[in-house]
A protein has these predicted regions:
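Short, glycine/acidic-rich beta->alpha junctions
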Residues: 7-8, 113, 140
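ATP/pyrophosphate-binding catalytic subdomain of soluble kinases
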Residues: 77-131
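Short, small-residue-biased leader/transition segments that mark boundaries at the very start
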Residues: 2-3
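Arginine residue identity/basic-tract feature
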Residues: 46-47, 56, 63, 85, ...
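Flexible, charged surface loops at secondary-structure boundaries
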Residues: 16-19, 96-98, 140
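Contiguous mid-protein beta-loop-alpha structural module that forms a pocket-lining wall or clamp
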Residues: 10-85, 89
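C-terminal structured domains
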Residues: 118-120, 130-170
Length: 170
């Protein structure tokens, strides 16, 4: 197994490092279950994985990666929804400012971005988050629908096409 050659990895990588330069480790395909504990991951301040590299992500893959999470870890699927997260934050920053009671997140089963989005919203809002599966194959916006349920109104963020996201606010 490639991750069991710990002494070899460190011996090869260490001489290439510049002193006082932050190190980022990137696994573009298969990553170790606990990137921060791997030989290269121990040397890095940031660790970037790509759990969706082969398009066959399972819930078990996400649970394994989540169990090994350490501050400084990130995934390309999380980075892929950066603009979407900005739209979501902007949508919530509009009147009326009511507390969110629950959230609905939808996206394709085989893409981890909707799961990352649901986890982020659960962590930030501390409200129930319901994840539904769609048959959409829109690669540019893997989170195809989002609804913030509030007492008197809802906020919806929907993908219209590869260039358009519709935000419906009261």
């Amino acid at each position: 197994d490639v991750y069991k050659r710990q002494n070899q990895d460190e011996a090869v990588v260490t001489p290439l490092l510049l002193p006082d330069t932050p190190l980022v480790a990137w696994w573009p395909t298969l990553c170790p279950p606990d990137p921060a504990s791997s030989s290269v991951g121990k040397l890095a301040q940031r660790r970037i994985t790509n759990v969706a590299y082969d398009g066959r992500v399972t819930g078990e893959d996400l649970r394994t990666l989540s169990a090994g999470y350490t501050p400084g870890d990130s995934d390309m699927s999380w980075a892929a929804i950066t603009l979407w997260r900005g739209v979501v934050a902007s949508a919530l920053d509009r009147h009326p400012h009511e507390p969110v009671q629950s959230v609905e997140v939808a996206g394709p089963a085989g893409h981890p971005a909707p799961d990352f989005a649901a986890g982020w919203l659960l962590d930030r809002l501390a409200v129930p988050v319901h994840r539904t599966v769609t048959d959409s194959q829109e690669p540019h916006f893997p989170v195809t629908h989002l609804r913030f349920n509030r007492e008197t109104s809802h906020v919806d963020v929907d993908v219209v096409d590869e260039r358009t996201v519709r935000v419906c606010v009261p």
